[in-house]
UniProtKB/Swiss-Prot annotation:
Keyword Transferase: no
The protein, known as: Meiotically up-regulated gene 1 protein
Organism in which the protein naturally occurs: Schizosaccharomyces pombe (strain 972 / ATCC 24843)
Function as written in the Swiss-Prot or TrEMBL entry: Required for correct meiotic chromosome segregation.
Cellular component terms (Gene Ontology): cytoplasm; cytosol; dynactin complex
Compartments (UniProt record): Cytoplasm
Gene: mug1
Lineage of origin: Eukaryota, Fungi, Dikarya, Ascomycota, Taphrinomycotina
Pfam families according to UniProt: Dynamitin
Presence of the UniProt keyword Transit peptide in the record: no
């Protein structure tokens, strides 16, 4: 069964007449009466409507304040700050409830005047439906209020809340700890996920932590021993080099001389940079001269070796000149020639 309402206007014939069923009228009224509490809205976007711009601006402001308070409550690490923020949230909830109740009463009066021209059955059904919807919304609101009050339960404070002091404290903490690139809510979520992983098997992670501690202790001991060995080697090398160069008495005498000359150093302060530059240039010159001397010394050594070889050759030649080898060889040649001639004569005689 559908009861139809004919809304035609005889005074304005240009307007198109429409027919609405009872269910459609009830659904429209339900949309007006069944408001959503502010706690359940969170950060959802509001529906756009050109009729209620002022009301929605007011709602949007309250919702922005509420969302900022929720973010601050999530980011705050102090219990006192959370208590103060929950008090502010309760105050905003009261303002929200008052505003919604006033809107509900206005909508009820408007709906009653709009439907007053209809029959009695329509009014009764609308009144029953509005009462039922109001009771349902009140029950849902009470349940949500109880849930939020339990989740954000905190004792009342004896002093008023000041946002400036909270901002100053947050600024001090950030100046001491440092500014994080990520928001605190994401960091807290990551920490919670890690804690959940650890809580799943605490014995396993405890054994791992103990093994890591042992490994770290061993690495620390090895590193410490290496540092000690290197320091001991450096100290021994320094002491040995100093002992080789000079004795302790010489070191004491040099220190006394340096300390006695310290007052005169101030007089030569403007000249010292020029002297240092001159010494650096002289150092380069000395290195070049040392290289030239070393190369000349090498060439001199080569010449000395060549001279010694020439002397040896001269000595051998002189020995050959003064030796009797030449005279002995000439005599032997004569003897050989004589023997050859004698042999030739004998051969001729035989012929």
């Amino acid at each position: 069964m559908k009861e139809m309402i004919n809304l035609d206007s005889s005074s304005e014939p240009s307007i198109v007449t429409k027919q609405f069923s009872v269910e459609e009228c009830l659904s429209k009224l339900k949309e007006q009466h069944c408001y959503v509490p502010m706690r359940t809205i969170g950060r959802l976007r509001l529906r756009k409507s050109s009729d209620q711009t002022e009301k929605k601006c007011w709602k949007e402001k309250l919702m922005k304040i509420r969302s900022e308070l929720e973010e601050l409550w999530e980011q705050s690490m102090m219990y006192e700050e959370q208590k103060e923020l929950t008090q502010l949230g309760e105050m905003l909830d009261r303002l929200w409830d008052k505003h919604i109740n006033s809107e509900g009463s206005k909508s009820e009066t408007i709906s009653d005047t709009a439907i007053s021209g209809n029959d009695d059955t329509m009014e009764k059904r609308l009144e029953q439906f509005s009462d039922d919807t109001l009771q349902d919304t009140l029950e849902t609101e009470k349940n949500l209020n109880s849930k939020t009050s339990e989740s954000l339960k905190s004792p009342t404070l004896s002093y008023p809340f000041d946002l400036d002091s909270l901002d100053k404290r947050i600024f001090k903490l950030e100046s001491k700890i440092g500014y994080a690139d990520e928001p605190l809510s994401e960091l807290l979520n990551k920490c919670m996920e890690k804690l959940e992983i650890v809580e799943q098997d605490p014995q396993f992670w405890q054994s791992r932590i103990e093994s890591w501690k042992q490994l770290l202790a061993k690495d620390f001991l090895k590193h410490h021993e290496r540092n000690l060995c290197s320091i001991e080697k450096q100290t021994t090398l320094k002491n040995s080099s100093l002992k080789e160069l000079c004795t302790e008495e010489d070191i004491v005498i040099m220190l006394e001389i340096c300390s006695s000359q310290l007052p005169f150093v101030e007089q030569y302060m403007p000249i010292l940079p020029l002297l240092l530059e001159r010494l650096k240039s002289l150092q380069n010159m000395h290195t070049d001269a040392a290289e030239a001397i070393s190369s000349w010394q090498g060439s001199k050594d080569v010449m000395m070796t060549m001279q010694s070889e020439l002397n040896e050759w001269k000595n051998t030649v002189e020995r050959l000149d003064h030796s009797k080898f030449y005279t002995q060889s000439v005599e032997e040649m004569r003897r050989l020639s004589d023997t050859v001639t004698q042999l030739e004569k004998r051969v001729l005689k035989l012929q």
